[in-house]
């Protein structure tokens, strides 16, 4: 237990990174996390820092999560810029960020997208940003990932046929 499970944490443009141990499934539980202001980052990384492969997953569980107005959250499972793979919430040897309590208030999903929360990765010189959903048993998961919601894609560079309930990228 690296951090007391009931310790409240307030982020004001800050970050939390949980590195799992190599060769083993790792877990950590934190108390109530409040996103007070600014751009915040929470990462759960399987394997040792600097490792390009992971054996074992890393599950970071938040007792609850609250987001104040003017605060946002980037959830990631990689902190290495040379790995272009957003595997957050995937089954297997990857990072997961879970919330014990329900996502309420301004974090309550709208069309299955969690407002104010996104996932990003660095991919060959460009930043790729995805909307995020919450999947029971997997936690935060970027849209478009296997087993998650998909983006509406009619083909080409158009929004033809999109409705107010479609998620368009």
Q: What is the predicted role of each segment?
A:
Residues 1-169:
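Beta-strand repeat architectures
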